[in-house]
């Protein structure tokens, strides 16, 4: 039995210099699992609650000592002696201990740190790499990365309203070659920006954050970078957007301040459709406000056959909300953020529900990250097919890419890279 004999929670810092939660779980055999949780900047209103201290004189109120204390007291007492290999039972124990719908009592950050650390300890105990522990012998598909090479919105201090402009390498035979493609486009873009006298400073997720005059100008420049790096836009590399539309939806209008536009749901749908006609855009995330389900339906009806429409703030990795979206024909993909829901069991349930409905599942980081690379193992372990984990800079982003390289190496000849077939929702 892989009995849990010790649990240690601690406060560490994330990639933005804000506190987050880390947890160590020690088993009877002496094996240990360690996990750290991420934190978002643009968050959905229905996400599980991240417990912060609210003490203004310490880390601006963002400390997590309360969450850490919950790990070291209540949670420790509840799961001490449990079998670490019984993940579903352990997560159920955490949910019952918290007793709220949104994990507001113990904090999703406390619960997730424990859930992840237990899984890592159990994998170590079993002598399995984490991806194999999650997925068994069927885990062999590397994910197609969506690489955020230009940051805007809440992730950068510039005039771009759309939060993320991403490149998606799809023609390469392996993940290693896809990663090389992304890195080469990233460096080509840096040279173009530098030659124009534009900023090459990076945002929270490692992408550049220059002041483009419009979203159109930004996308055109990315196409130039793809060509400069020796690749073909629309063939070797596709584009993806994260609008994070909830961030610029005010008074019933989508207010693109950078372009001086105020658009209705129908008008913003047309705006996005025009971009998708002009550029090789394969995926649009959060193209409408999380509560604008009528707008989402309009967007899905217009673009859902040719563009992946990803619900992030819309679904918040929650099976109850996802089920409603599937029934109503809203979006065709879900973004999976482990800290939006707070346990691995619930995360995996959301991925499986999406797949059964023909929706894709995109495994995602948060803008506030750590060196923890668990999401890379989740992406492969559950054969998710897609991952979104930032740009080609900042070690908090690169740690996930490097872990995927290791996994591909470990898989050897049975490793596969899906390319365009990862977008099975567009068939």
UniProtKB/Swiss-Prot annotation:
Enzyme superclass (EC): lyase
Descriptive protein name: Enolase
SMART domains in alphabetical order: Enolase_C, Enolase_N
Cofactor(s) recorded in Swiss-Prot or TrEMBL: Mg(2+)
Binding site for (2R)-2-phosphoglycerate: 163, 337, 366-367, 388
Record function comment: Catalyzes the reversible conversion of 2-phosphoglycerate (2-PG) into phosphoenolpyruvate (PEP). It is essential for the degradation of carbohydrates via glycolysis.
Active-site residues annotated for this sequence: 205 (proton donor), 337 (proton acceptor)
């Amino acid at each position: 039995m892989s009995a849990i004999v010790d649990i240690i929670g601690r406060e560490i810092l994330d990639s933005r210099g804000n506190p987050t939660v880390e947890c160590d779980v020690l088993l009877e055999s002496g094996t240990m699992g360690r996990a750290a949780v991420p934190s978002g900047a643009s968050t959905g209103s229905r996400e599980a609650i991240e417990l912060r201290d609210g003490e203004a004189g310490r880390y601006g109120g963002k400390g997590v000592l309360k969450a850490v204390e919950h790990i070291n007291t209540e949670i420790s007492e509840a799961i001490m002696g449990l079998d670490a290999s019984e993940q579903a039972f352990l997560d159920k124990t955490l949910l019952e201990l918290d007793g709220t719908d949104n994990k507001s009592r113990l904090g999703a950050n406390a619960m997730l740190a424990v859930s992840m650390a237990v899984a890592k300890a159990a994998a170590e105990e079993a002598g399995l790499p984490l991806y194999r522990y999650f997925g068994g012998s069927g885990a062999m598909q590397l994910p197609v990365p969506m690489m955020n090479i230009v940051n805007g919105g809440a992730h950068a201090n510039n005039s771009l309203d759309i939060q993320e402009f991403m490149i998606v390498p799809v023609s390469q035979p392996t993940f290693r070659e896809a990663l090389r493609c992304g890195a080469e486009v990233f460096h080509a873009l840096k040279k173009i920006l530098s030659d124009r006298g534009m900023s090459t400073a990076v945002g929270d997720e490692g992408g550049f954050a220059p002041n483009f005059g419009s979203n159109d100008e930004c996308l055109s420049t990315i196409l130039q970078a793809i060509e400069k790096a020796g690749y073909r836009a629309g063939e070797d590399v596709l584009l993806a957007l994260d609008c994070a539309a909830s961030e610029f939806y005010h008074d019933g209008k989508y207010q693109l301040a950078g372009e001086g536009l105020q658009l209705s749901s129908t008008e913003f749908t047309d705006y996005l459709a025009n971009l998708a006609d002009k550029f090789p855009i394969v995926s649009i995330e959060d193209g409408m406000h999380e509560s604008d389900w009528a707008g989402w339906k309009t967007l899905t009806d217009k673009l859902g056959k040719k563009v992946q429409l990803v619900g992030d703030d819309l679904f918040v990795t929650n099976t109850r909300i996802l089920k409603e979206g599937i029934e109503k024909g809203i979006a065709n993909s879900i973004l999976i953020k482990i800290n939006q829901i707070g346990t691995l069991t619930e995360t995996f349930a959301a991925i499986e529900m999406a797949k059964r409905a023909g929706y894709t599942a995109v495994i995602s980081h948060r803008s506030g990250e750590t060196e923890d690379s668990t999401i890379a193992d989740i992406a492969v372990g559950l054969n998710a097919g897609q991952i979104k984990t930032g740009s080609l800079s900042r070690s908090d982003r690169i740690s996930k890419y490097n872990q995927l390289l290791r996994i591909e190496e470990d898989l050897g000849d049975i490793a596969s890279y899906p390319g365009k077939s990862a977008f099975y929702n567009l068939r």
